[in-house]
Amino acid sequence: MRECGLPAIVKPCVDCADTHHHPSGKFRVNANGKLLDVWLLLCCSTCGRTSKVPVHERVHVQSLEPARRLAYETNDPSTVRALTMSASLAAKTGYRLDWTGTWRLETDTPFYSPREPESITVLVGFELPVPIRVERLLMLGLNVSRGEVRRMVARERIRLPVPMDLGAKVHQDFEFTVDGAGSV
């Protein structure tokens, strides 16, 4: 899974009818005595209005590691990236992530077909934690239909990691094996 961009943040804009925002690349850090507020700044994709998502509210300055505090103060791009993709921050602050157009599947399938006699072990690696169904990954990667994927799993031609279900969403690296046509 190759990264093509960060997910859009879906929340209503107060100025226009659009719901898609993108990170501005900046944080706002406000200290009031010993208490600190940190917000991730977003821009509306249509009108450009800036809005903020609370990252930390009224936390004691000493409760944040100095390196983390410095990352907020210097608008560290990797911290902006990590918080933009944070499903827990999205859930906590009431928005959702739109992963449309943020990834593409790179595969060597022109060099392998499920009809070939050899078995193959496939490593699926994620540059982005895109939540995608296992079934869809297999369809795209092997260039076969949903029904064919289900048949291959039922016949154990596709062997998935034990706790994995075709309908489950994955976002971390995993391996699976496709048994060749000659090994059935």
What are these regions (language model features)?
Residues 174-184:
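Long, intrinsically disordered, low-complexity Ser/Thr/Pro-rich regulatory/activation regions
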Residues 55, 162, 178-180:
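Conserved "cap/hinge" positions at secondary-structure junctions
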Residues 1-134:
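Ferredoxin-like alpha/beta domains used as RNA- or RNAP-binding modules
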Residues 125-176:
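A basic, amphipathic helix-loop patch mediating RNA/tRNA/ribosome contacts
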